[in-house]
């Protein structure tokens, strides 16, 4: 028995069950700029057991200290980060259901968004399969990431391949909203 909710406030009681006070303090600007977190709640215990952060704006360079990679988002794009499900619930299709909840959240609160970028480490086969097979995502770009401490992240300069896309200085190579890196424009997906 689960329910899902979109959270726009770092003081939400369910979000506080999953995140440290330090991270919630760091992420106040994330929420102020329109970001949200989609939470999975186990109803019998009223406990948060899954989360998915949705970045809806292009972060500033100083946001690296908040754990936000420097992604260049167009007006019709967002970035899915920090998808996590408690190990006790991973076999119950909670992450799959959250994909549909993401769609419902975007339809309701962000109708202008057309594309959702995700992120998975190359060696994280489970996340990559989830993104490709269930969410219908495909690889558009590879980067090398550097992490310092608990939160600070950045992209190793020059590691973006190909040189156009969300992690490149110029963002995606097409401004019309229909053509995405890694896919033909024919509509065959």
Feature-to-residue mapping (PLM):
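Conserved acyl-donor/pantetheine-binding loop and adjacent beta-alpha core of acyl/acetyltransferases
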Residues: 28-29, 33, 45-78, 82
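Conserved acetyl-CoA-binding loop-helix of GNAT-fold acetyltransferases
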Residues: 79-85, 91-107, 133
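C-terminal "cap" of GNAT-fold acetyltransferases
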Residues: 145-189
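Conserved GNAT acetyl-CoA-binding A-motif
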Residues: 107-120
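Core beta-strand residues in small-molecule sensory/regulatory alpha/beta domains
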Residues: 39-43
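Conserved active-site alpha-helix within GNAT-family acetyltransferase domains
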Residues: 122-143
């Amino acid at each position: 028995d689960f329910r899902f909710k979109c959270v726009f406030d770092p003081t939400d009681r369910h979000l506080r069950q999953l995140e440290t006070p330090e991270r919630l303090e760091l992420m106040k600007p994330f929420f102020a700029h329109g970001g949200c977190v989609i939470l999975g709640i186990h109803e019998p215990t009223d406990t948060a057991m899954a989360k998915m952060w949705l970045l809806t704006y292009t972060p500033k360079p100083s946001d690296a200290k908040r754990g936000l990679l420097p992604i260049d988002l167009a007006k019709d794009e967002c970035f899915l980060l920090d998808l996590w499900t408690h190990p006790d619930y991973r076999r119950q299709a909670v992450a799959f259901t959250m994909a549909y909840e993401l769609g419902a959240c975007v339809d309701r609160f962000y109708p202008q968004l057309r594309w959702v970028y995700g992120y998975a480490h190359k060696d994280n086969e489970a996340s990559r399969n989830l993104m490709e097979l269930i969410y219908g995502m495909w690889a558009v770009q590879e980067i090398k990431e550097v992490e310092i401490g608990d939160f600070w992240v950045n992209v190793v300069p020059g590691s973006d391949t190909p040189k156009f896309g969300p992690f490149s200085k110029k963002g995606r190579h097409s401004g019309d909203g229909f053509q995405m890196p890694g896919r033909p424009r024919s509509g065959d997906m």
